[in-house]
Every structure is written in C-alpha cells, then in structure tokens.
C-alpha cells in the first residue's frame, strides 16, 4: 500500500556513485528527481538555470544532497539545508555515537539573545494566542492550505480546531512557543512553528524537552528560506525558558535520525480508499475480494473492554509508565498529561479527537490493558466522489501481559486488543487505521492485514547525542520483533 499515488523520489538503482573527494556524479534524471522531492535543495538552487543548478549539485556530497529529501514525495516540508544543520547542535551523519548520551552544546542563558533575528522586509514575528478563536482559525487556515509542499498531492491534512487545541495546549503549554510570521501590511499569518513541553526518557536519562510541530510556510514564500529562521526563533524562545533540548519528527532525512519507523495502513473501508486513490487493486484480485479480505467482525472480543473514564486515569498512568519504560526512547507521562492526551471531554471539545478504551477484569475489576487512537482527517483533492478520508492513528497502549516475559502471550494479547481497536475505529466511521513500527507494533501489523506504506518517519533529538535506537524494522524495512524496544513515543 502506498502513502502516495506514485513513488516519487525513489532513487534509480545503479546510477549514483560518490567520487573520492566526496562529490557525487549526478545524472540529469537524478538532479530532476532530487529537486522535485527536496524542498530545501530546491530553495538552495532557486533562481539558477538548470545547468548551473546541476553543476552546484555535482559539487555537493551525499550528506548535502540527502538533507531534506523525502523518499515518498508525500507531505514534503522544507526542513532547511545541510548548511543550516551544520550550524546546529545535532549529531553529524558521519559521527559515531555511543549509548552514553548527553547534550551536544551547553547553553549559557546569559548569552541567549533577548530579541529575535530580523525578518525580511514586509514580515514580522507574531506570538499566536490559540485561546483566541480568530487566531486559532488563522492557524487552521494556514495548515489546511499550505502544510503540503506538492501541488499535485491528492491528500492534504485537515487538522480540526479541536485537534489544534488538543495538540498545542497540553499541560504546561506556553503561548510564546506558538510562533508565527505575519505580513506587515495585510496582517496575514504566513508561517508557523509550534512547540509544547514534555519530559522524555532517553536510555533512562530524563530530559525536559519541547516537542516541535506544525512548521508551515505559505506556498508563495517557500523560496524565502524562512525555515532556518523559524527553527532558530523557536530555539531562542525555548532557551529563554530554560529548555535546551527538543524532539521532532520529519518524513525527510536530516542530520541525524535517532530512529526511523515505517508507516503501515489497515483499510477499514477498502472501497472508499480505492476510489480516492489511496489503496491500489492488487494484480489478479477483484474489488469484491479486497472488500472481503478487509472485512471485520461487528463486535469486539475482549471481555471487560469499555471506554476509558476519568476514574481510570491513575491506573492507566501507572500501567502506561511501566509499559513505556521497556523502550529506550519514551515519553515520561504525568497524570495531567494522561488526562489531557487520553480522556475525551465531550462537554468542552466540539469534535472528538481521541478515543481510549480500557480492559477491566470482570472478576477483579482491575485495569489490565488499554489502547487509544486519534483522528486526523485528510481532504481529498479533486475527487468527484469523496472529499475526505477519516484516518485513525494508533496512539498509546499498554498491557499487563508485557510484564510476563512471554512473547507469545504478548503477541496473542495484542492481536486481540488491536483487532478490537480496528472494530471500534470502523464503528466510529474511520476509513483507514494507521500505525508505525514503534512500541510492540511489529507483533501484530502484518497478521492484522496492515499494508506497508512507502513513507518513513524519522525521529530527531536537538542538542542531545545518543546512539540510534531500533525503529521496529529490519534491513529490508519490514517489521521485525527483534528490532523492537527502541521507540516508545508517539509524535503527532
């Protein structure tokens, strides 16, 4: 199953060779493909004619060419060039990391600038007030129409206002970490980058970090090289608040991933996914056969399964923390974060964002398991029959079975729980159920008929060095039970 209709950016085999001086032989086809799928590189060569651009690329090394490359061509974002990342406290591609982690750069708060860098004439910095419905709507508009780089994309994320509230106003959120750029004359919001505070564990080292998200630039300003300026500005604001590390994800290659996971997709409404171009019809199969293959039971099978309630927060918090401690990179949840991220509050939330369920033992009434998923719709662009795809994303889950040290029992339990999650998502009118190869997901993805996507999600740490952790896939990029235990954090 493909994350995009065509596999843009897949490198032609046997056409790349690196010279001894680090430069690369670039064929015209490779140059065109690299520019098409690499917004950062495209902006670096903006204004050059084709020959000059090709010549500039020939002088680059592999690291420079790859920085900012999206192998799937989907949801491309300009994440800045290799030259910029060379100036940042991030691990280099060519360095050898050890398990013993630590900050790359010690920040002296006295030396952090109290003022932001100047923007291009005609633009100014803004701090977004997401408690203000007008400003929330402005951010929604920017993300809705400009979060996808490829003008030919078939799908565009549609973040609801409820989703933005949920994602950006978590416990401890700071208004100054919701950064915008406005056009001075029109006051129009033309760029954003946002962060929320949390704590993570990196190989048992607890770090206060900012989760960075929603880096978005208006399409008409993509050549203005705003990305590095946005990253530097939110970094400055975090430093001023005493936070010197960050975690972020990207579908593009940057220096240097701490882990990489693969997307998997389980059709819930196969026919609709086929009609919008998301799911292909396999050779030799029929529509009827695919619908039958992806059919799900109408009722769940786990005894004691019910929606999570506020009374479950303490028990779920304890279970989740113990479960996540099994992973090298994980989120250190507080009770307040469990409440915020997992409990739907219908009295205050216009549109449901998260669904969470617990398993209460019918005899002991103890909570033995829980799972959750969240809603992220996509707008379908120029399709005569459908205008949206409702996607459920597997979020956090945990089970007491994980502590039995019985892998067979854990696999059986997760197969039951996740099959029920699929059934419940189908009942909630979702069209597809998405998951990554993190947590213990490799134990059930293939058996529950998840199809492999062509997209990767790379995890990055800013100003922190540690050896890479496994992302649940082997050297063939397939789910592998032996490659679990690395990523225990889900980024929106």
Curated annotation (Swiss-Prot):
<dbReference type="InterPro" id="IPR022676">
    <property type="entry name" value="NMT_N"/>
</dbReference>
<dbReference type="InterPro" id="IPR022677">
    <property type="entry name" value="NMT_C"/>
</dbReference>
<comment type="function">
    <text>Adds a myristoyl group to the N-terminal glycine residue of certain cellular proteins.</text>
</comment>
<feature type="active site" description="Proton acceptor; via carboxylate">
    <location>
        <position position="492"/>
    </location>
</feature>
<dbReference type="GO" id="GO:0005829">
    <property type="term" value="C:cytosol"/>
</dbReference>
<dbReference type="InterPro" id="IPR016181">
    <property type="entry name" value="Acyl_CoA_acyltransferase"/>
</dbReference>
<dbReference type="Pfam" id="PF01233">
    <property type="entry name" value="NMT"/>
</dbReference>
<feature type="binding site">
    <location>
        <begin position="215"/>
        <end position="217"/>
    </location>
    <ligand>
        <name>tetradecanoyl-CoA</name>
    </ligand>
</feature>
<dbReference type="GO" id="GO:0004379">
    <property type="term" value="F:glycylpeptide N-tetradecanoyltransferase activity"/>
</dbReference>
<keyword id="KW-0963">Cytoplasm</keyword>
<feature type="binding site">
    <location>
        <begin position="82"/>
        <end position="85"/>
    </location>
    <ligand>
        <name>tetradecanoyl-CoA</name>
    </ligand>
</feature>
<feature type="binding site">
    <location>
        <begin position="223"/>
        <end position="227"/>
    </location>
    <ligand>
        <name>tetradecanoyl-CoA</name>
    </ligand>
</feature>
<dbReference type="InterPro" id="IPR000903">
    <property type="entry name" value="NMT"/>
</dbReference>
<comment type="subunit">
    <text>Monomer.</text>
</comment>
<keyword id="KW-0808">Transferase</keyword>
<keyword id="KW-0012">Acyltransferase</keyword>
<dbReference type="GO" id="GO:0072657">
    <property type="term" value="P:protein localization to membrane"/>
</dbReference>
<dbReference type="InterPro" id="IPR022678">
    <property type="entry name" value="NMT_CS"/>
</dbReference>
<feature type="compositionally biased region" description="Basic and acidic residues">
    <location>
        <begin position="1"/>
        <end position="22"/>
    </location>
</feature>
<comment type="similarity">
    <text>Belongs to the NMT family.</text>
</comment>
<dbReference type="Pfam" id="PF02799">
    <property type="entry name" value="NMT_C"/>
</dbReference>
<feature type="region of interest" description="Disordered">
    <location>
        <begin position="1"/>
        <end position="45"/>
    </location>
</feature>
<protein>
    <recommendedName>
        <fullName>Glycylpeptide N-tetradecanoyltransferase</fullName>
        <ecNumber>2.3.1.97</ecNumber>
    </recommendedName>
</protein>
């Amino acid at each position: 199953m493909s994350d995009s209709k065509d596999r843009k950016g897949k490198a032609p085999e046997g056409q790349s060779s690196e010279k001894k001086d680090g430069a690369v032989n670039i064929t015209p086809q490779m140059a065109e493909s690299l520019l098409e799928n690499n917004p950062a590189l495209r902006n670096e060569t903006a204004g050059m004619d084709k020959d000059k651009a090709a010549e500039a690329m020939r002088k680059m090394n592999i690291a420079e060419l790859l920085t900012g490359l999206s192998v799937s061509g989907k949801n491309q974002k300009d994440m800045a060039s290799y030259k910029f990342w060379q100036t940042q406290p991030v691990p280099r591609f060519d360095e050898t990391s050890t398990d013993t982690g630590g900050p790359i750069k010690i920040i002296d708060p006295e030396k952090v600038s109290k003022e932001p860098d100047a923007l291009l004439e005609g633009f100014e910095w803004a701090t977004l007030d997401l408690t203000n419905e007008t400003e929330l709507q402005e951010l929604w508009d920017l993300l809705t129409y400009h979060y996808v780089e490829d003008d030919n994309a078939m799908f565009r994320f549609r973040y609801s206002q409820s989703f933005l509230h949920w994602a950006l106003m978590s416990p401890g959120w700071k208004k100054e970490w919701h950064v915008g750029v406005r056009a001075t004359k029109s006051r129009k919001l033309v760029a954003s980058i946002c962060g929320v505070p949390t704590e993570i564990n990196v190989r048992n080292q607890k770090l206060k970090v900012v989760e960075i998200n929603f880096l978005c630039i208006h399409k008409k300003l993509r050549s203005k090289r705003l990305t590095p300026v946005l990253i530097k500005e939110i970094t400055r604001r975090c430093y001023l608040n005493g936070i010197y590390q960050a975690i972020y994800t990207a579908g593009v290659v940057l220096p240097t991933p701490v882990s990489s996971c693969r997307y998997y997709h389980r059709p819930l409404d196969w026919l609709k996914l086929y009609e919008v171009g998301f799911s292909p019809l396999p050779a030799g199969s029929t529509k009827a056969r695919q619908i039958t293959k992806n059919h799900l039971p109408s009722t769940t099978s786990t005894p004691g399964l019910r929606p999570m309630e506020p009374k479950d927060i303490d028990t779920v918090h304890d279970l989740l923390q113990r479960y996540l401690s099994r992973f090298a990179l994980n989120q250190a949840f507080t009770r307040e974060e469990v409440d915020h991220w997992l409990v739907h509050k219908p009295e205050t939330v216009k549109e449901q964002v998260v669904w969470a369920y617990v398993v209460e033992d019918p005899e002991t009434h103890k909570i033995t398991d829980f799972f959750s998923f969240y809603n992220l719709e996509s707008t379908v662009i120029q399709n005569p029959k459908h205008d949206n795809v409702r996607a459920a994303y597997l979020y956090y889950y945990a089970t007491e079975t994980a502590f039995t040290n019985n892998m067979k029992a854990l696999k059986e339990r997760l197969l039951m729980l996740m099959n029920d999650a699929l059934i419940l998502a189908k009942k909630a009118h979702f069209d597809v159920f998405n998951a990554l190869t993190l947590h213990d997901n490799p134990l059930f993805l293939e058996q529950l008929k998840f199809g492999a996507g062509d997209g990767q999600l790379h995890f990055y740490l800013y100003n922190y060095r540690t050896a890479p952790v496994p992302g649940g896939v082997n050297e063939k990029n397939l789910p592998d039970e032996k490659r679990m235990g690395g990523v225990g954090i889900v980024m929106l």
